[in-house]
């Protein structure tokens, strides 16, 4: 492979039933970085023979103890930036290696409180509804319905990371909304 001594540096892991299909399937989610020595070219990206961090998010549908379907997302722009290739214009947020949750408690290998999961899902759906409905008079008012004032946004390369509601609006939401008309979630 392209990476020598490859490690999976997992920051988030959880599983649960999928709302999109009426809670009829179980999916497992994992996020973090693959870390290794970038020693050989990878899909046209030249190797630099240095440590590299490849951000990933993967989702697996599990049936009868086996993986039946997988979706894998990797931040190729981040890998390209690590070798000095910048194929898109300057991002509005900061380019960083994204850490896991602040309290380092994102690895949920055991069963969790069902009510807490339902409450979290309701909050996520409310946030998506707020974005789709456009019912608030300002971006600040919209975001404060669901987000903490000192929220962190760990956007992919090309967008970048930002911190606090005000900077999120300035560095991500405003540029994204003015450049992407007609967006919808689920």
Question: Where are the predicted features?
Answer:
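C-terminal and inter-domain tail/linker signature
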Residues: 1-186
